[in-house]
Amino acid sequence: MKILVISSNLIGDTILSTGVINYFTNKYPETKFTFVIGPSAKSIFKNFKSVETIISVSKKRYNMHWLDIISNCYGKKWDIIIDFRSSLLSYFLKHKQKFIFKKKSNLNHVQQLSNYFKFDCSDLFIETNTEEEEIVTKHLSDDFKYFVIFPGGNWKPKIWSIKNYNSLLIKILSQNKNIKFILVGSKSEEENYLNEITKNIDSNKIINLFGASLTQTAAYMKKSKLFIGNDSGLSHMASATKLKSIVLFGPTNDVIYGPFMQDSQVIRTNESYDYFKSINIDKTKSYMDSISVEKIYFTLQKNNYCE
């Protein structure tokens, strides 16, 4: 069986769709998948054993990238086409069955998928390889608990202050000597945040994973205790690796993109998402100031995340 998946360009949405892929993999174990996907998200499937082809497509002017996609997929007989981008591509290709998913508002994204496909889409996954797992084993110790920290993001308004992250880490360490922090994100986020988030913190308490691949990051998450970070693709990766999480929300929609995993928590600003929709957002400033360090630390204690 051959399945064509037209995936999102976004890392987060791609990760949230893996429950669908998981279902079809289990139902049809011999299936070979072809993924049409953006360059930033393509590595999510690099270790996926059922992948046949990954077609990486970058956006072009006047939507000319769709011609590239058609040329790569045309002339083949697809058993199933799964389109997460609500495109017209399937109408140009031979297929036996198709699913064209369109996002809606005011319902968790994974629940939207489950409602559309009429099966449980919550079993997310991201596969890691032996080399990635051996690196984790080499660097992590059973003597410590590891918190994954993501202080960055692709949109300034939803990024909590790096000074607050630093204060939170210091507060956690003051009461918990057996915790270490794994800092994740891109190389540019390393340049922007590393020095300030680690200020006055013993370097032995920090594992700098900025710039690591998505799958290497996932391998570390699989061996960690907790994720704390801004609304992002990496917060969804925490769900895919079954890592409990505390995700911070302000001018983004926690109803749709909040973690659905049991024992994970949403902490949002005093202002609701509807409030942020009603104002003009200044893209150069953060709107997360009403979330206090104390509020997050209280959530840690209340849910026994440090134990």
Label every PLM stretch briefly:
Residues 1-307:
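Catalytic machinery of carbohydrate-active enzymes
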